[in-house]
Structures are given as structure tokens and as C-alpha cells.
């Protein structure tokens, strides 16, 4: 069962999941985002251990549309079917929050993401060009 959490210890456990992903967020940044509150929602599936988690945010995107942004999503690889449950859950949350779109940012290969997320109706809309300043 996917449920909303506001427990600081669970936030820390979610931060530990970063080491199992290629996510570029730091633990400090993810934790800060989760405790920020207002437009951020954190959901988990925990039975004996954490099987999955989602950190989402509701804001206006660059075109002004209310958008549910997936900040961080993790599934235990032993529970692959949970992925489909979280995709449906995120869509229901977007409807609940009256969002017009769902978006996420990733640094993974565009082709692999399009293949995986295309099954759920997602498509590439923007490209991000950046220059790192030291």
C-alpha cells in the first residue's frame, strides 16, 4: 500500500536509496526538499522494508500550467510490478491536485527513458542545456 509520510527517519531512509540510483541529487538536497513541506509530498510502500518511494512536487511549469513533478522515484528491483502501481498512483495524485501535466527530469539515456516511460503515455517535450560553473 502506498501512503504519504512525514516521518524524518523515513526521509533519511529515502535519502539512502540515492546510492542505488544514478540520480544526481545529493542526500542533503533531497532531504532539504522533502522537509520543505508546502508543495512537496512523500509517499512510500513499507511492509517489513521499504519497497518503493516517490517524492513529488506540485508547481507551475515554465508555461504556467499546474504540474506534478516527480523529484525522486525508487523501487526495490525485487518488486518490479510495483513500478506500474506507482505510475498509476502518481497519475491519480496529479488528478487529485488538479494538475494538467506530470513531468520528471532525468540524466539517463533519452532512448531508454522514452522506451520505459512511453508505455505510460510520457513523451519528451523539453531539452535542458546547461553549463557548469565552478
Please give the residue ranges for each predicted region:
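Short amphipathic alpha-helix that is part of the acyltransferase structural core
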Residues: 1-27
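Conserved catalytic-core motifs of GNAT/GCN5-like acyltransferases
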Residues: 105, 123-134
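Conserved donor-binding loop and adjoining core beta-sheet/short helix segment
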Residues: 44-79
